Amino acid sequence: MMRVKVKKPILVAGLGISFLLWLGESLHEQAIAMGEWGVLSLMAVGTGVWWWQKKQPQKPAYKTLSPLTITEVNQAISEGKKILKIVKQEDSNYNLVELETQWKNLPQKLNNQSVSWGIISNSNTDKNSLKQLLEKEKIADNFNYLESEDDENVKQKLDLIVFLINTDLTESQWQMIQKCHQNHQRVLISLNQSEQYNTEEQEIILQEIKQRVKTIIQSDDVIGINSKQKIIKVRQYKEDKSYQEWNETQPPNILALITKLDSILSQEREKLILGKVWREAQKIKQQAKVILNKIRRDRAVPMMEKYQWIAAAAAFANPVSSLDLLATAAINAQMIVDLSSIYQQKFTLSQGQTIAATIGKLMIKLGLVELSTHAISSLLKSNAITYVAGGATQGISAAYLTRVAGLSLVEYFQEQEINPNQNQSLDIEKLSTKIKQVFEQTKRTEILQGFVKQTIPQLS
């Protein structure tokens, strides 16, 4: 068989170690030549690199999920019903017929034995070849094959995914596999034999993939296959050192994958169905939450705007900084109480005051107060028509910061789990992130110009 020379991981590792040994010896000789100050400089640089690496954000540890239980699936169904009920309570005119019908059908789907599968691959040629081979083996008759491509909605419907690759996993592919795992989708990784690698190299890559994914995918779920016919050149040597050479056809080989699919069909169908119903329940829950958030936001924004105009008037009437801050804090506290009521958090006035003080400190710490005041002052001075003497800058700044606080709280509340029977404590870190995001979205000159023009009439 003709062999193609490629860089092997073992060879690369060996060369790397040799290079490091040479580099270490060279640095040692140079360090002696540089003397004490040179060594101290190297130590300083090394310390700086170590400190910089410590400062870099660490990737969050990946959470491995336990297999779904019927109790967890029923809980997901129940949560969907709960949110649909809240939507009807808050807006009885909203049309929920389609979502309610989908929700009512979920318990019946637990008894439905139909499961869906699909192949995800960067190569359409490899994907189609494998699909055709599986169809010939009648394996596909037991599944509903879905052409996923890049359609996320279709991917969500897949109970079993054959992840077809022809080389090592990329980071984006690994992230996609993790996402499938989080969605309780069954994943098989099939390494398709490539002409780029010989058999030995293919096996090395296969073992590396198994090692990388072992936290969420079992070793026997990473399978080497050959989905396409290959022509191999064979050379046979004789005793007189002459040789004969001919081509042999190597047929496709997907037996290991077929065996695994048969095993899943006979032993894991119930798990696949639990995953399917759980995902559908989550989708209904998410869609209902989007509707509920829209209903609540439509009520929250006018209320927030009322308080931003009150804050503007109070700051305009009291341009002294200390009075301005006290008035704005008191107004924000009441706004927080009212917004929390809309989102079923129901903070007391005392809690509202504490949160308002926290938001004020966050804004000062992030530099938002100074930045917004400077930007608004510049806009006012650049336009003689809109410029108003006295406390205009403070009035508009107070309104703007009240709006940022209100929008940040709305965004924060919308991401919280919906539980009307339990008040949730405020996550300051998440709220701080929301404040920064809202400020970034609203600080653009054209947005601030529009806000200034909108606020000026409120001060007259």
Feature annotation, model-predicted:
Residues 2-150, 407:
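Conserved G1/Walker A P-loop phosphate-binding module
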Residues 4-14, 292-331, 357-366:
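Transmembrane alpha-helical segments and their cytosolic interface motifs
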Residues 351, 355-383:
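A structural-propensity feature for long, helix-poor, extended segments
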